[in-house]
């Protein structure tokens, strides 16, 4: 497809809308610039040929008009000279030029339309390229900030997840400690009760040696004698 065949696409292109839809505006802004500069080069190359065609069509159209006027003028002179036969020939020639003039007029209109479209495409591309060049650094800077923020958000989410895990671990530890305390209490309740009387009897149990008993009896006897 020739560049002029892309007139509607180029003229309807909306740079802002294209960038808004792009997943990575930083990369796409460079791609769009390359594409538009390529289109601009094609427009410039083809514009010269289209404008030359416009000038040629316009020149041929005016030349045909001039020839028709000339044939009519010759016919009038022939009639004035009393030569109707020559006048008829000049008028026949004028009639044939009329059909040619219609064709040249149509070709001239097409060439003029093509030239106008090429100029519009040229101006649109120059304008879009200028706008994109002016916004390129800002777009890249904003994209870098957005990606940095995205990484920070992911890091924050990871830290939050870790905190939640630690909190869950703490709750688990409390649950284990509670279960252990309950088990210890139950074990204490299930242990055999202490026999208080047995302990008291053991306190006064004469489990000492017979020598001690003999010495105690001798001491008592001595105390009786001293009285």
Curated annotation (Swiss-Prot):
Residue spans crossing the bilayer: none
Superkingdom assignment: Bacteria
InterPro entries the UniProt entry points to: PspA_VIPP1
UniProt keyword list: Coiled coil, Stress response
Expression induction or repression: By cold shock (at protein level). Expression is sigma W-dependent; induced by alkali stress and by infection with phage SPP1.
Pfam families linked: PspA_IM30
Coiled coil start-end: 33-125
Region called Disordered, residue ranges: 191-211
Similarity comment text for this entry: Belongs to the PspA/Vipp/IM30 family.
PANTHER family assigned: MEMBRANE-ASSOCIATED PROTEIN VIPP1, CHLOROPLASTIC, PHAGE SHOCK PROTEIN A
Name of the protein in question: Phage shock protein A homolog
């Amino acid at each position: 497809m020739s560049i002029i065949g892309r007139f509607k696409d180029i003229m309807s292109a909306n740079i802002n809308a294209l960038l808004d839809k792009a997943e990575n505006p930083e990369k796409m802004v460079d791609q769009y610039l390359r594409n538009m500069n390529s289109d601009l080069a094609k427009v410039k190359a083809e514009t010269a040929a289209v404008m030359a065609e416009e000038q040629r069509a316009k020149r041929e159209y005016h030349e045909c008009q001039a020839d028709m006027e000339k044939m009519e003028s010759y016919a009038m002179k022939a009639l004035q000279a009393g030569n109707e036969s020559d006048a008829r020939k000049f008028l026949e020639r004028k009639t044939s030029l009329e059909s040619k003039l219609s064709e040249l007029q149509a070709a001239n209109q097409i060439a003029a339309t093509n030239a106008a479209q090429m100029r519009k495409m040229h101006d649109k591309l120059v304008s879009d390229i200028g706008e994109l060049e002016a916004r390129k650094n800002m777009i890249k800077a904003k994209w870098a900030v957005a990606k940095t923020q995205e990484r920070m958000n992911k890091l924050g989410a990871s830290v939050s997840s870790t905190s939640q895990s630690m909190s869950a671990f703490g709750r688990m530890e409390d649950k284990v400690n509670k279960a252990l305390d309950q088990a210890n209490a139950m074990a204490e309740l299930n242990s055999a009760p202490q026999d208080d009387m047995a302990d008291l009897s053991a306190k006064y149990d004469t489990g000492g040696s017979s020598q001690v008993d003999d010495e105690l009896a001798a001491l008592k006897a001595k105390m009786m004698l001293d009285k």
